[in-house]
Regions:
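Bacterial N-terminal signal peptides that target proteins for export
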Residues: 1-12
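Bacterial N-terminal signal peptides
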Residues: 10-21
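Mobile, glycine-rich extracellular loop/lid and propeptide segments
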Residues: 27-29, 34-35, 40-49, 63-67, ...
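Polar/charged, compositionally biased leader and regulatory segments
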Residues: 55-57, 61-63
Length: 540
C-alpha cells in the first residue's frame, strides 16, 4: 500500500470510530438528542477523499454527510457494528425473489427530485419501526382527502423480508396552506428524524415549512392536518428547482427562489425558523431559476448553479458573489439544472450543462479561486436545438480514497445526435481528465432522456459492489415503446433493468445490510404516481 494512503486510512479510521463512539456516548449521557442517518438529495452532493480528510479531520464532525458515507465505505464486509450478518452469496442477483413493494400515492415527484430516507440507528441492524422514507408530492392536498406528504415504515418488507409482507403508512399529511400549494422540490430531515423541512410552492410565492410528525396520523386518502412552522421566505416568487440545503452544525438552511435569489434561514430544527438579515438574501441571477445550493463548510462557500448557465459562489460570511461561466442560457434547455457537487477536502466543484455553445459539458472548478480546472465534453447535448436536460454525475468508490483512484460517471448524448450515452472520466491528482476513459451508447432512441446518477458502495454484496443507479425516460424495451426504466450498473457495462413508466425520480439508497429486503433503493416514476422500493442487487 502507498505509505501516504496507509497514513490516511489509519488517521481517518481513528476519526470515524471516535466520532461514532462520541455520538453513542452522548446518547447515553443526560437527556441526549438522538442522532440517526438522514439520507436525502444532498447526501451525494458532498465529495471527500480519505487522504484529504486526514488533513481536515474536523470535517467529519462538522459535516455529518461525510461521517455517514465513511461508515459505509471504509469497513470490513460483514462488520457487526455496521449491519453485520452473513455476506450475500454471489448468486443473490439471480435468486428469483419477488419484486419489492410499490404504492399508488396520487401524486409524483418532479424530475430530479428525491424522497428522503431515515435510518434510526447507524450502529444497529435496520429497524422496521424506526426507519422510514418520506415523499413530498407535486399535487395540492386536502385534509380528510388526498395527502401530499407521505411516509412509510416497515420498509424491509417483501419475499423473505425483515419486516413481513408489506410496508406500512407511517403518516400522511395535507401540507397545503394556500390554494394550489404543493411540494415540487426535495424534502430534508433533522438528524434525529423527528422533523421534516420542505418548501410549499405556490404560483407566486414560496413557504418554508418544518413539520413534526406523529406516527399513525392520516392515510393516503384521509390526510391529517400537520403540526408545523411556516415561513414565507419568498413572498413574490415561487420556488420550483432549488431544494433546501441544511448545515446541521449551525442549524441553518440555504435555498433559492425563482427570482434568482438565495435565502438563509436560521433556527431550522432546533429553534424557530427565521429569515437571516443582511447580506441575505443574495441576488445571484436575476429572473433565472437556481439549482439547489451546496455548502463547502471547509471554505465557507455556498455553491449554486443557475438556468443562465453560470456557476456561482457565495461567501456565507459576507455575501460576496463570484461567477464562473459553465454553459449557455436560453434556447431549448436551461444552462444548469442539477445542483453542483462539491469536494470539501480537495477544494473542487463540479457542474453539468447541456450546452456551452459547442457541446454538453461537465466542468470542474477550483472552489477557492472560481477558475476552471477542467472541462469534459459529453456529446451534442442541446446544441443542435433539441431540448436536453442533463443531471448530476456520480463518483466511483475509489474516488473516496483518492481522486486519482476513481472516476466520475454520468449521462450525455451522442457526439452528433441526442441518443443517451454514458461517459466516464478519470483523474490526475485532483484534476479531472478531459479525455474520456469509457463511453457507451445506452439506447438508439433520440427521444429517450437520461436521469441523474446515484452511487452506492455495498461491501456485503459479492465481496464489495459499487452500484450506479439511474434511469431512462422511454424506449427501454423497444424504440417507440413508452416504457421508461431504472438501471443498476456495476462495472462499465453490466446492467440490470426494471420498468418504471417515464423513468425514475431522484433515487435514494438505504443500507448495506444482509437482512432480507434491507439493502434497497427508493424512487417514484416520472409518469406514474407510484412509489417504488427495489433491492440494490437485481432490482427485485
Amino acid at each position: 500500500m502507498n505509505p501516504k494512503h496507509a497514513y490516511g486510512a489509519v488517521a481517518v479510521w481513528c476519526v470515524v470510530f471516535f466520532a461514532l463512539g462520541s455520538s453513542m456516548s452522548a446518547q447515553e449521557a443526560v437527556a441526549p438528542t438522538h442522532t440517526g442517518v438522514p439520507q436525502d438529495w444532498s447526501e451525494h452532493h458532498i465529495l471527500f477523499s480519505r487522504d484529504g480528510l486526514a488533513l481536515h479531520p474536523d470535517l467529519i464532525y462538522r459535516e455529518p454527510r461525510i461521517l455517514h458515507q465513511a461508515m459505509q465505505r471504509w469497513q470490513k464486509p460483514n462488520s457487526d457494528v455496521f449491519r453485520g450478518a452473513d455476506p450475500l452469496p454471489a448468486s443473490a442477483h439471480d435468486s428469483g425473489q419477488g419484486r419489492d413493494w410499490n404504492v399508488l400515492l396520487g401524486g409524483r415527484l418532479a424530475p430530479d427530485m428525491f424522497p428522503a430516507k431515515y435510518s434510526f440507528n447507524p450502529a444497529s441492524p435496520p429497524s422496521c419501526s424506526g426507519d422510514y422514507v418520506v415523499f413530498g408530492l407535486g399535487t395540492p392536498g386536502v385534509t380528510g382527502g388526498r395527502a401530499n406528504l407521505v411516509a412509510f415504515n416497515n420498509l424491509y418488507a417483501g419475499t423473505g423480508g425483515l419486516c413481513g409482507a408489506t410496508e406500512t403508512v407511517l403518516f400522511a399529511y395535507n401540507i397545503t396552506t394556500a390554494t394550489g400549494g404543493e411540494i415540487v422540490t426535495s424534502p430534508i430531515l433533522s438528524e434525529d428524524g423527528t422533523k421534516i423541512a420542505f418548501v410549499e410552492s405556490l404560483g407566486t410565492s414560496a413557504i418554508f415549512h418544518v413539520l413534526t410528525w406523529t406516527a399513525g396520523q392520516g392515510t393516503l386518502t384521509d390526510a391529517a392536518a400537520p403540526t408545523m412552522t411556516s415561513l414565507t421566505y419568498s413572498p413574490s416568487f415561487n420556488s420550483t428547482t432549488s431544494s433546501p440545503w441544511v448545515d446541521y452544525g449551525t442549524d441553518t438552511v440555504y435555498l433559492g427562489a425563482d427570482n434568482g435569489e438565495v435565502y438563509k434561514i436560521t433556527g431550522v430544527f432546533k429553534g424557530t425558523p427565521t429569515l437571516a438579515g443582511s447580506p441575505w438574501p443574495v441576488t445571484v441571477s436575476t429572473s433565472f431559476r437556481l439549482t439547489p445550493p451546496v455548502l463547502d463548510s471547509n471554505l465557507g462557500y455556498l455553491m449554486v448553479g443557475s438556468a443562465n448557465g453560470n456557476l456561482y459562489r457565495i461567501n456565507i460570511a459576507t455575501g460576496a458573489l463570484s461567477t464562473l461561466v459553465v454553459g449557455k442560457s436560453g434556447g431549448t434547455s436551461p444552462g444548469i439544472i442539477a445542483g453542483p457537487i462539491v469536494d470539501v477536502t480537495n477544494g473542487t466543484t463540479f457542474a453539468v450543462s447541456a450546452n456551452d455553445g459547442t457541446s454538453a459539458v461537465l466542468v470542474q472548478a477550483d472552489t477557492a479561486s472560481m477558475t476552471q480546472l477542467s472541462k469534459a465534453r459529453l456529446g451534442e447535448g442541446s446544441t443542435g436545438g433539441t431540448a436536453i436536460q442533463l443531471y448530476e454525475p456520480a463518483f466511483t468508490n475509489g474516488y473516496f480514497t483518492n481522486p486519482a483512484d476513481g472516476d466520475v460517471r454520468l449521462c450525455g448524448t451522442g457526439a452528433a445526435d441526442t441518443t443517451p450515452w454514458q461517459y466516464s472520466f478519470g483523474f490526475i491528482g485532483r484534476t479531472m481528465r478531459t479525455t474520456v476513459s469509457f463511453s457507451q451508447q445506452l439506447l438508439t432512441s433520440t427521444a429517450a432522456r437520461c436521469t441523474g446518477w446515484t452511487e452506492f458502495f455495498n461491501p456485503n454484496i459479492n465481496g464489495g459492489t459499487d452500484f450506479f443507479f439511474f434511469g431512462l425516460t422511454q424506449d427501454c424495451t423497444a424504440t417507440g415503446a413508452p416504457g421508461g426504466c431504472v438501471e443498476a450498473l456495476t462495472g462499465t457495462s453490466t446492467f440490470t433493468t426494471t420498468t418504471v413508466d417515464g423513468g425514475p425520480s431522484g433515487i435514494v439508497v438505504d443500507n448495506y445490510s444482509t437482512a432480507g429486503q434491507a439493502s434497497s433503493i427508493y424512487l417514484m416514476g416520472d409518469k406514474i404516481d407510484y412509489a417504488y422500493k427495489f433491492t440494490q442487487n437485481g432490482l427485485q
